[in-house]
């Protein structure tokens, strides 16, 4: 995938493929096939009811009718959320279509910027374009908006700020993404990860990175403002019991220890190999084999590439943590510590970002160290993109 005169056509090709991917929604309109991940949380219906209620700016205890015999306004997203206004201004399906377009476009460019600026370099733009396209056609859980799709873009901005190479656009990304994403589903864990990077710099490099600290504080503050209704629900008793809370309160009893360990092992391996419904990275058939080859190259050639095994390890640990949370072994702890129940282990929403970092780094090693590596990488990327279509 070395640079050449044909590379100038790659952006046009990837753009065309993205248009083809989205085109059924445009051509067939409301007759299109739409994937529904979770019937309990079809957010377009909830937002439609909110828009029709006239309570977008309502008080916390204002009642939204026609849903569970009425729910308080604080149980739904705040008026600072972009998706609320998409549904209000354009209606459910146009809002869904616009949301899908934004997700795909930002996913592509965010991953492209992350790869070319920080991971594979600008001399491998075709590789970056292909991996970014595969990332853009993942089956995203649309109710979380840009919570997953924007992570590469936000990470790229944070890394530039960390290195002191930031521009105004990087601060705009960090300041604006909270209006179109979810703190609860993904970004609380993303912010925690950035905080750990800041602590690492503080301890290992003896450096108080003011800009990185400021960026973390800025994004956290904006999220707290955008999600103020969620914060209100956490702190004050509204008298409303959500489906999630009711489900948690009926958590099964603690299983026998060894049976619980068995469940953890099986679920960890299954999540690692197959992924989940809401955070599916489509890693099974092409990304994992690429990662295996990449790790074999590291072992055989003694290549100093620490990010690949580190990212793979993080994925495995997240699968292990999620399986442990759901095993039942933590039930006594959940009953005693309220916040464990509130913050479901949605660090799994970081997995698509990590899997595609692993994919890109593995393909880079294949290109550099395997005979006909460029051809192999091209085939793997093409198959992964095709897999995303189905």
Model feature map: region roles:
Residues 19-108, 145, 236, 252-262, ...:
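Membrane-interface coil-to-helix junctions
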Residues 13-19, 207-231, 246-250, 312-315, ...:
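Hydrophobic alpha-helical membrane-interfacial segments at the cytosolic entry of transmembrane helices
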Residues 108-118, 123-203, 215-232, 384-389:
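Membrane-embedded helix bundles of polyisoprenyl
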Residues 1-28, 125, 211-215, 377:
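Start-transfer (signal-anchor) and selected internal transmembrane alpha helices
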Residues 227-300, 345:
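Periplasmic/ER-lumenal interhelical loops and adjacent helix-loop junctions
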Residues 138-146, 304-368, 390:
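Membrane-helix boundary/interfacial segments in multi-pass membrane proteins
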Residues 109-117, 152-164, 194-202, 290-298, ...:
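Transmembrane alpha-helices and membrane-interface helical segments
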Residues 126, 364-389:
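Signature aromatic-anchored transmembrane alpha helix within multi-pass, membrane-resident enzymes
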């Amino acid at each position: 995938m070395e640079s050449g005169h044909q590379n100038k056509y790659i952006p046009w090709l990837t753009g065309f493929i993205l248009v083809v991917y989205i085109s059924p929604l445009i051509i067939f309109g409301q007759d299109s096939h739409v994937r529904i991940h979770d019937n309990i949380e079809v957010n377009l219906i909830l937002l439609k009811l909110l828009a029709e209620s006239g309570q977008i700016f309502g008080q916390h205890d204002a009642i939204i009718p026609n849903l569970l015999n009425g729910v308080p306004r604080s149980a739904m997203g705040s008026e600072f959320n972009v998706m609320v206004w998409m549904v209000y201004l354009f209606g459910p399906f146009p809002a869904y279509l616009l949301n899908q377009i934004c997700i795909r476009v930002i996913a592509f460019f965010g991953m492209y910027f992350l790869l070319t600026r920080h991971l594979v370099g600008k001399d491998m733009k075709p590789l970056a374009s292909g991996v970014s396209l595969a990332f853009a056609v993942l089956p995203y859980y649309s109710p979380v908006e840009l919570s997953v799709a924007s992570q590469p873009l936000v990470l790229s901005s944070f890394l530039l700020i960390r290195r002191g190479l930031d521009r105004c656009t990087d601060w705009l990304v960090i300041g604006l993404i909270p209006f179109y994403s979810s703190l609860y589903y993904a970004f609380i864990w993303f912010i925690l990860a950035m905080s750990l990077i800041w602590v690492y710099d503080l301890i290992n490099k003896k450096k108080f990175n003011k800009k990185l600290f400021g960026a973390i504080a800025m994004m956290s503050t904006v999220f707290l403002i955008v999600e103020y209704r969620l914060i209100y629900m956490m702190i004050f008793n509204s008298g409303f019991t959500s489906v999630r809370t009711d489900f948690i309160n009926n958590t099964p009893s603690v299983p026998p220890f060894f049976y619980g360990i068995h469940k953890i092992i099986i679920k960890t391996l299954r999540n690692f190999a197959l992924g989940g419904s809401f955070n599916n990275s489509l890693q099974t058939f092409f990304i994992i084999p690429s990662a295996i080859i990449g790790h074999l190259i590291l072992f055989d050639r003694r290549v100093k590439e620490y990010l690949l095994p580190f990212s793979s390890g993080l994925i495995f640990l997240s699968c292990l943590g999620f399986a442990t949370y759901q095993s039942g072994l933590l039930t006594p702890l959940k009953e005693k510590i309220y916040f464990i129940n509130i913050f479901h282990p949605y660090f799994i929403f970081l997995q698509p970002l990590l899997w595609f970092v692993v994919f890109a780094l593995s393909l880079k090693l294949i290109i550099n160290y395997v005979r006909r590596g460029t051809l192999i990488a091209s085939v793997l990327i093409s198959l992964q993109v095709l897999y995303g279509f189905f």
